Amino acid sequence: MIVYWWLCYHAISAEQIHENLQGPSILRDSPICHNEERDHFDGGAFPRDFIWAVATASHQIEGGWRADGKGNNIWDEFTHYWGVYNNNEFNGRSNQGRCNIDGCETADVACNSYIQWERDLDLIKDMGLQSYRFSLSWARLLPTGSVADGFNQAGVDYYNKLIDGALDRGILPFVTLYHWDLPADLQSSFGGWTSRKIIDAFAEYADFCFDHFGDRVVNWITLNEPNVFVDQGYELGVMAPGVKGQKWLARHHTILAHAAAYRVYDSKYRARQNGQIGITLNTDWSEPETEADRDAADMFMDMELGFWAKPIFVDGQYPEHVVDVIKRAGDAHAEALSFSQEESSQILHSSDFFGLNHYYSIITNKCEFSDTCRYGHSSFSCPNWPQAGPYWLKSVPWGLRHLLNHIHEKYNSEKVNSDGSVSAGSSEIYPPN
């Protein structure tokens, strides 16, 4: 298993992003909150071949938002302008004191890794870490998002330096193709992840990256946390691009786009590059409050994890009970949630490993279907769980253990790449021991 720790946190407000993602945690005491043996879980020592690493995302650390021919991405527009996309047209304008992000923060400079990449790699080496997961900026490589419109040589040069620099320092690169920063032109021209056109666009972009970097990169991730960037950016509208009500359509297209990129690698590059490629999914662990709540907790897991994991790892189809609940709720585009036989065959087994991001655990109970309980479950957090640095994050190590067992049992996955840690709230770096 591989664990990634963030090297540099979000340049844009982490508090704002995670308040939108998690919501202010609902704290409620319950008998299940108190289990001393469980809560003081100690997993023992890590195996000798365990790989320690750090992870970043291009928009969160690079800066250089207009440097050397880079195109705008949806986060550039979301942070620089106040407004949202309607019918694929961005109605944003100069913020005039109103912003989509707390404090009108942007990632124009961020951690300045576009300039300071050597310093960052030296830090990773000095920490004794063995791997570095970073993402490529689609708009830095393809300013309009389209291969047909030409590529940006400066962007290719930057990532060549980063990859070669990592390898020269004995650091194994894990490269993510998409970490939420869609080229703005693809959003404005056809609606980004709400359109089937994104499938071919993403596959062509992936092909470009495999061709230019795959001679040295042997570990690829297609999409990072699709449930987060879709649910927050295309349903609630609180993240880029600020679209509302398009959740299930956009979710559907992420699976098809991922599978298309995987098949490009499988058919054109695997034999000569000998790498591996997969998708990274994000989920909380959902613990039932009582035995009567187990079905509700399972529904949460199937909606947040199984929505992608079952088609990819089990049978090429969505969980039927999840689709039924979505239709019962009357959600828009629920009718789109099915695959043709050809699509199903493309999706099934389209990941060489189970990529997992996990930060949080919750207690789940059932509730009657209503406007405030659309899917039959609700969740809360225990006030006695240890508080981490961010206000929304609590330390629940046994939740990760339960989650890993769930993945092993339900998806028969032996190979898990995992991202997640708990910070104590300090920016200091402490020496070992």
Feature locations, PLM:
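Active-site region of glycoside hydrolase catalytic domains
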Residues: 12-101, 125, 144-146, 153-433
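Short, well-structured secondary-structure segments
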Residues: 130-137, 172-176
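Internal amphipathic alpha-helical repeat/solenoid segments
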Residues: 109-122, 143-146, 151, 155
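Cleavable N-terminal signal peptides of Sec/SRP-targeted secreted and luminal proteins
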Residues: 1-14
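Active-site mouth loops of central-metabolism enzymes
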Residues: 102-116, 194-196
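Generic anion/oxyanion-binding catalytic loop in active/binding sites
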Residues: 3, 106, 113, 148, ...
